[in-house]
């Protein structure tokens, strides 16, 4: 499901605005989930869930991290059952393609890039991906979509209180800049 730009920041929005937002309506529709079960009228109903892996795939840069955080905030606040049931993952596209002659490797960080450049030696070229749209279909498949070579980070909630605090800190009215914040790594799948 392609989202257009940044999803609504549900941390700051009134609840009625969340459910009026077209991108959020599209997420509910695409996933096939509804609100309300026989036991709890406010619980997320996963009976008709269409996908068992919901993959958040954003650019590998700071803007992509911000969009991922907006989406994760939505899932945490409104679809927490999906996270608790192990359905939510984050794709990890590379930041760089490092090439020399016929050798090529992808790098997911500046440190990875620097090591590859050192290993490849002089004559190495580097392509930085500003976004997923800059990759051709083959590159996107090789790095982010191919089940044999992709890396997904499974989203888990180890401490709901701490997660609540972090989402409020990052996305709330008194949000701090998260460009320098290091969050714990998640499970690699």
Residue ranges and their predicted role:
Residues 180-189:
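Single conserved hydrophobic/aromatic residue that forms the stacking wall/gate
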């Amino acid at each position: 499901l392609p989202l257009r730009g940044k999803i609504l920041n549900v941390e700051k929005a009134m609840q009625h605005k969340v459910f009026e937002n077209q991108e959020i309506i599209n997420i509910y529709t695409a996933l096939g989930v509804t609100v309300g079960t026989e036991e709890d009228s406010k619980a997320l109903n996963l009976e008709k869930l269409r996908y068992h892996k919901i993959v958040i795939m954003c650019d590998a840069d700071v803007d992509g991290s911000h969009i991922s955080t907006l989406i994760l905030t939505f899932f945490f606040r409104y679809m927490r059952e999906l996270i608790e049931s192990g359905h939510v993952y984050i794709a990890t596209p590379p930041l760089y393609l490092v090439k020399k002659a016929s050798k090529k490797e992808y790098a997911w960080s500046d440190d990875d890039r620097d090591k590859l450049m050192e290993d490849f030696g002089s004559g190495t070229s580097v392509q930085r991906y500003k976004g997923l749209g800059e990759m051709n279909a083959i590159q996107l498949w090789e790095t982010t979509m191919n089940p044999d070579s992709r890396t997904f980070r499974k989203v888990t909630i180890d401490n709901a209180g701490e997660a609540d605090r972090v989402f409020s800190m990052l996305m709330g009215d008194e949000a701090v800049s998260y460009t320098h914040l290091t969050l714990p790594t998640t499970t690699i799948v």
